């Protein structure tokens, strides 16, 4: 039975709803709707000019309506009179096929048709920086190896604990928070869930972290590589596939190598097969490739892959199998669109299951030290343009995510690359002025 948002508002004391959708570039767009008007919005959606956000639309297109999904409503723990609700984009009474949440829902349904239920957990890393974005906010956070630094995390206790308390209140079951490998960097973990719910939570988490940071006079950034020489922001994703009831893990086989079943290996095989094209979505910005192709950081490791390899419990590879019944994709970064991340994982994984793809040999080596000895594993794209070209060549992935989505994404991202190439940098000035 669909939750009535008007009733929800009366029972919870909600005065306003943020009807929110995510555009192709991961931007979160919303309208603040008074509770008195939510009944009409729940029926027909809140109207937007789609061209004003990152979609391949024109000013001549009719209104884009964001139809709230009442099952995804979240009352803001820090502002109880407001509730956030994820929305699906429609136009002329039909789903907008290029909208990320629409794309994900289609792939979740496809997996269900094959008796599969994808569950995932994400690990979005972020920096707490100065309001102007120029430096790390904690001037004492200067250690060469700051990971798990207890003094540093306690200096940011007020921010981290407040966010964690809110996740506890929301029933997300958070289980750990830590200072990460870069100065000023943090990670907060909560329990895995169905792919769509994970995407909704991921989207809300970014909104919540930024909001609470601002409340404390700080700024939070999920930018993949905000500071030269420091470890970048990853968004590792743990993946498992279950039966439709969510009771039997189809990836688990304690007798198999790494505890990964044949079906799990096939799903992983799809990820490996499509990895270079995946990067166009999992690493969607120019800056993303400063993380996955970075030189050694001050702390000693980038903690990011640069080759298409997998292994057991070893964090130097693109895919890690830390235990039976799941694997971790370490490729995505903090700029990834929460919905497209889940969508492209399902698309690639289903491709592997259908074709019984083999993930290939695994390498039990330190890729940071000995990766140069591996000659039969593809390198990940060197830049956004290379990744877009890989996606453009991957007909199977384009078909799986939808031709309308793929065309729109490639067009807008190519435009972003062209804009980047038109920039005149200080490096050019310094290195070329006197030639």
UniProtKB/Swiss-Prot annotation:
It catalyses: L-glutamate + NH4(+) + ATP = L-glutamine + ADP + phosphate + H(+). Optimum temperature is 50 degrees Celsius. Optimum pH is 6.8. Its cofactor is Mg(2+). ATP binds at residues 240, 315, 320. Residues 100-435 form the GS catalytic domain. The keyword ATP-binding applies. Pfam families: Gln-synt_C. The keyword DNA-binding does not apply. Keywords: ATP-binding, Ligase, Magnesium, Metal-binding, Nitrogen fixation, Nucleotide-binding. Belongs to the glutamine synthetase family. This is Glutamine synthetase. The gene is glnT.
